[in-house]
Amino acid sequence: MKSQLFGYILMAFVIAVCIKMFIDSDYYNLSCIVSTVDGNKYCVRVKDDLKHQETVDLLAKVTNKCKKIVSYMGSNYGNRENVKKLVKNFNPKKVKEILPTSEFTAYSENKGEKLAFCTTTQKNGGSLIDENTLTFVALHELSHIMTKSIGHTDEFWNNFKFV
């Protein structure tokens, strides 16, 4: 009887943890919308102000700039190891808005597997960040993708200057 009760408690705990993980995930918090700028889908936070399309189009504009930069660097500096790494790992289809629960304003996950950006001036909403500021942040994240080391090392800062 005690082992059966323990089993029920354990099962309830596992289910609660799974529900918590789902509620904190991209799948629950983000809605994927097609951009009018480039026709690609971008996943953005569901906000009360209904500015989803503006957010998606902002991400599309910045992603297009990143694609041009990566293409230019690949064409003109393709023999450099850091540029090869950037060209190989940058995936414009993996750009999305950051979750409000994130402690970061932007990040690249696993050197390009996912790029996430905060698109608003305040963590839980506010007005959209301007395109030039978000482009600067995106260049910062591209520099992380092309850097072997993790963090803001000398290698990273040299790559950021290069970009």
List each model region and its residues:
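Walker B catalytic acidic pair
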Residues: 141
